[in-house]
Amino acid sequence: LTLWGNGKARREVIYVDDLADACIYFMKKKTKEAIINIGTGKDYKIKEYANMILKKIIPQKKIYIKYDSKKPNGTPQKVLDINLAKKYGWHSKTKFSDAILKTYNHFIKKNAI
């Protein structure tokens, strides 16, 4: 597996069902806020994501990760301030490890992998 840059850039990800849940939640809530950040509030290094995904979907194999230093690292960190969402009572429900399996199984079921 080859990752761009050094794999140290940090990213926040959210499972699609949690995002959909947040959209419905806040449409029903009818807040006066123009913008409410939706996220998990947790970020990991890209190389950590890669390792977590590999361990979940192919735990029996050792996959080596290479880093392509000719490619950019990207912005050092992308994580949202989700305090306003929490204030209104919303939080993501799906752990990243569960999201990996749900997503992987969906792709297998649809013969997309």
Summary of predicted features, one role per range:
Residues 1-113:
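C-terminal substrate-binding subdomain of Rossmann-fold SDR/epimerase-dehydratase oxidoreductases
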